[in-house]
């Protein structure tokens, strides 16, 4: 992981966001995004004290995806995370899980947060397995929270606390 930089806001990134077939379950891909909107999102995020954007890179340093910590609650020490592998052909297997593990370490030990959570469509099996491999626990669900292909789908909630993370990684 490295900080997302202005040079990363390019046609490749835009094509990932607009690829609804490959990123079917990523909510930010539901509507077409323009270059202007993507740049605005990046600039707004840079100014925020409650979100941090990262580039996911392969071993060659190629930008293959993004992840974020957002809605940081500095009082209750918690945040939501999101991630997307956009360049699947240059992505080694397990890149999403590894990125999540690095994100967890950063959130717990650099930001001193206590809880990380996310919501995942129950049909997104790849993401569910990745969350479980990274030590996240399925702690509940929100019924019929997503409308996909004319069907309401449940969202599964995954979380991990600093104590759980430390127990797994010590």
Regions found by a protein language model. Give the residues of each.
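Conserved GNAT-fold acetyl-CoA-binding loop/helix
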Residues: 21-42
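Acyl-donor (CoA/ACP) binding surface of acyl/acetyltransferases
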Residues: 2-9, 19, 53, 58-170
């Amino acid at each position: 992981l490295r900080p997302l930089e202005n040079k990363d806001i390019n046609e490749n990134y835009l094509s990932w966001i607009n690829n609804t077939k490959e990123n079917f379950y990523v909510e930010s891909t539901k509507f077409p995004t323009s270059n202007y909107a993507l740049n605005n999102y990046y600039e707004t995020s840079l100014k925020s004290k409650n979100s941090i954007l990262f580039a996911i890179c392969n071993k060659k340093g190629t930008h293959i995806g993004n992840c974020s910590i957002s809605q940081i609650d500095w009082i209750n020490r918690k945040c939501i995370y999101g991630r997307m592998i956009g360049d699947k052909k240059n992505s080694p297997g397990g890149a999403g899980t590894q990125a999540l593990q690095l994100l967890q370490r950063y959130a717990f030990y650099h930001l001193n947060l206590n809880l990380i959570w996310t919501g995942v469509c129950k049909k997104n099996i790849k993401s569910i397995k990745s969350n479980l491999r990274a030590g996240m626990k399925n702690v509940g669900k929100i019924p019929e929270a997503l409308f996909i292909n004319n069907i309401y789908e449940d969202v599964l909630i995954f979380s991990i606390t600093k104590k759980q993370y430390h127990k797994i990684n010590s």
